[in-house]
Swiss-Prot record:
UniProt source species: Staurastrum punctulatum
The gene coding this protein: petG
Pfam families, per the entry: PetG
Gene Ontology BP annotations: cytochrome complex assembly; photosynthesis
Protein name in the entry: Cytochrome b6-f complex subunit 5
One example GO MF annotation: electron transporter, transferring electrons within cytochrome b6/f complex of photosystem II activity
Amino acid sequence: MVEPLLSGIVLGMIPVTLAGLFVTAYLQYRRGDQLDL
């Protein structure tokens, strides 16, 4: 009963975590560009 729920939570969190890391890296990259200017 618990395993499908747990796997669903994990599968749901993986894309969110990857998206968060991507956005953070993108914002840091933009900030670096602005500092260079």
